[in-house]
Structures are given as C-alpha cells and as structure tokens.
C-alpha cells in the first residue's frame, strides 16, 4: 500500500523539528516527522533532561525535559494533521512526480517538500569499552541522567571529567548516599568554577584512575574495578549505580547519500534555507551559512522561514501571506 504524500516531511524530531512541525500545522499543512531515536526531543531530552537551559526566549531557565514537554504540548494542537515516525533512519530521498520518495530503514515515505532538522546527526554514547558493559546498560549503568531522584540513597560512581560528569556529581551530592568521580587525569575539563565547587564538595574524587573491569550479578553491576594510571594500584568500588559520562559521538553518515551540497556535517543553505536541491530545506544545526550561531533560539527563528518557503514551493499559486497566530487561533 502506497503511503500518502504529506505536504512537509521533517527529518529530525528535536526542538527545531518540533517547532517547525508546529508552525507548519499553524499554516494548515500536513506534516510528518521522521526521528531516528525512540523518543522526541533530541539532545535536550536525551543528553541533558534535568540540566538548566538559559537561552530560550521568554524563559529565564528551564530543563531539557521541560523544553521538550512544552514543544510536544504545543504541537499536540495539530495532532490531527501530524504523523510521527520514531526509530526510523533516513537513508536516501529521490525526486519523484509530485514530490519526493524518502527511504528509511523501515519504510518508504512520500512528501511534497522536505525540511531537514536533524542537528549534527545521530548520536551515541562513548562507552567504557569493558566486557559485560552492555549487559548492565540501562539497568544500573547509565550514559545520561533522566531523573535525579532515581539515585536517591544510592552509592553512585561517575566516570568522566567533563562538564556533564562534574555537573551530575554536584547535582547528586545531596540526593545520593555517596558520589564518587573517577577520572583518568588529575585535571578536569569542566568549567573552572564547577571544578572549584566539586573540590569543595563531599564528592569523592579518584584521579588519575581508569576503569578496568565491571563485576555484577545478572543485569546489575555491583563493583567497578579501577587502576591508577601508570601504576599497579587497583581499587574495587562498590556501587548501586554507575554513570558513564564520556560524552557522545555524532554522525551524519547518511548525508553523503542525500545528494546535497554540504560542508563537514552541515548542509549548505541559501538565506531562505533552501538547499542545493529545490524543495528541500535545512534548519538548525543541520544548516550551514556564513555567520551562523548554533543555538536552539537560532533554529527556532529559522523554522518559520523554511516552512513558509516550503509552502510557497508546494503551492505557488496559493495566497501564502503570513498571518500572525493571534488571528489564527482562538
């Protein structure tokens, strides 16, 4: 059965893709979002759901989870004209009569126009690289923190020395029974002020040590074996939960198959966010142009222009004058 052709398909369900979908709904067109992850929200939802964000207009501060929740709630107004496809990776798209054929790892989709809002691409956590690590993952070994309360009263070990590792350690200090940070260097890569707070806290710091083995029963890790760098000293740390904060690697590996002009991992666009292929637009971190500032707020501003240009492309004979939302929603 042939999939119906949507007006606009948005590749990427992060903050910019979600707002673009909302604005497209506001303009009265049908929208499909294709997201490679198992949930919407992109990096704010997955990587820093409980960290504060300070550069979203009209919000003095809010967490990544709150930002995602607000965007999904905003989009729900147009759920009757919005379709969401999760855990689908866009492999290729081709120009066909009436629009584009979009092939993913699961299906073939059809769209009259495309807006690419996939950020820097798919991302995956950098792991410890230890045997049996995968067995414990998502049970009591975590690569990102969704809820701080889940660690209440626990012995928590954090591996890493960057901003995320230090921030989580400080955030968990008053929640967990104990917090231990293991880092391979004596110096931390985090912001100086955060490091000062860490050193003045009750968090246990073990440097320079590297993880060597995990011990546990079933799917639960019980001990992390660490070794001092360039020495034979070995320690076994008892734990209830282990947080691995080595960062994430990103990849736009399929970009080369999309037949678009790009630089590094971003797509070259015009001032109207048109890519090198007519009918395909790019916004957010996926888009590259002179003077680009990679902020969520920037992407929010790019979304309406891209949506309006997509509508002009699809319906060139329609009266496409932009109307303020106060005139469209009661």
Swiss-Prot record:
The UniProt record gives the binding positions of FAD as: 35, 43, 48, 90, 123, 285, 326
Report the co-factor binding details: Binds 1 FAD per subunit.
Entry annotated with the keyword Oxidoreductase: yes
Molecular-function annotations in GO: ferredoxin-NADP+ reductase activity; flavin adenine dinucleotide binding; NADP binding
Q: Which UniProt keywords apply?
A: FAD, Flavoprotein, NADP, Oxidoreductase
Pfam families, A to Z? Pyr_redox_2
Cofactor annotation: FAD
What SUPFAM superfamilies does the entry give?
Answer: FAD/NAD(P)-binding domain
Catalytic activity, EC: 1.18.1.2
What reaction(s) does this enzyme catalyze?
Answer: 2 reduced [2Fe-2S]-[ferredoxin] + NADP(+) + H(+) = 2 oxidized [2Fe-2S]-[ferredoxin] + NADPH
Q: How does it assemble?
A: Homodimer.
As for family, the record states: Belongs to the ferredoxin--NADP reductase type 2 family.
Q: Which HAMAP family match?
A: FENR2
Which protein is depicted? Ferredoxin--NADP reductase
Lineage start: Bacteria, Bacillati, Bacillota, Bacilli, Lactobacillales
